[in-house]
């Protein structure tokens, strides 16, 4: 839950300053992704009023402040991934060609087919798919470390949901494809169906979690650099 904060209060507190002085938002916004910056803005517009939710958010920020972790994802991955995921028109679906076999002739046909589409949708889709593979694999390693911290696991169930998705059998091919640099037509068709169509909701859930991590690390870094002390969260009386 969150309480409503009006524009006048936001201005009085200098949350989003339109003047030359730095705003509170600008002070804490060192996010590496556009998604992270947007979520931080939403947090200021919709402050939490629930003790458990505030405690959880505080614990997550405290964890990143304590461990001094940096954001391990590349911003360029998210631009490519978001652009790719935004178009779910069936006409843009990548399909494998069952007529192409393993012979040298078929291999040549396959390469020619890819070249024809290089400057259009195939190249963009391939870049988006590979970016998602990198994001999910990085998130896999990152959350595996987080899951070992009792302070985090004791206050949030979100991490369990993330691990459930990543550890599921359907995402196993994504983990196995770590570090892949190019996709064949069949590989592109397989991952396109898996990520953009069959599991679109789960993929967006993972991305949203990464954007929140971006925010927590951004806030934690600002706090540590400026010597800020984390306030103790107490329940209302």
Residue ranges and their predicted role:
Residues 1-173, 202, 209-212:
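Conserved amphipathic alpha-helical "coupling/scaffold" segments
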């Amino acid at each position: 839950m969150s309480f409503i904060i009006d524009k006048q209060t936001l201005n009085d507190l200098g949350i989003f300053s339109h003047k030359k002085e730095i705003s509170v938002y600008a002070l804490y916004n060192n996010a590496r992704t556009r998604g992270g910056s947007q979520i931080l803005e939403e947090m200021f517009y919709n402050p939490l009023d629930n003790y458990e939710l505030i405690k959880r958010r505080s614990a997550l920020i405290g964890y990143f402040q304590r461990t001094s972790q940096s954001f391990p994802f590349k911003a360029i991955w998210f631009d490519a991934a978001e652009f790719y995921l935004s178009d779910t028109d069936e006409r843009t679906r990548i399909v494998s060609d069952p007529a192409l076999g393993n012979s040298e002739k078929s291999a040549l046909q396959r390469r020619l087919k890819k070249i024809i589409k290089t400057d259009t949708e195939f190249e963009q889709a391939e870049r988006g798919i590979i970016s998602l593979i990198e994001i999910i694999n990085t998130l896999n390693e990152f959350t595996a470390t987080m899951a070992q911290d009792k302070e985090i696991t004791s206050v949030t169930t979100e991490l369990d949901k993330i691990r459930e998705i990543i550890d599921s059998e359907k995402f196993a091919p994504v983990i196995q494809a770590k570090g892949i640099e190019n996709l064949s037509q069949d590989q592109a068709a397989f991952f396109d169906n898996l990520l953009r169509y069959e599991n679109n909701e789960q993929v967006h859930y993972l991305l949203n979690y990464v954007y929140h991590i971006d925010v927590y690390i951004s806030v934690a870094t600002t706090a540590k650099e400026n010597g800020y002390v984390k306030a103790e969260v107490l329940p209302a009386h």
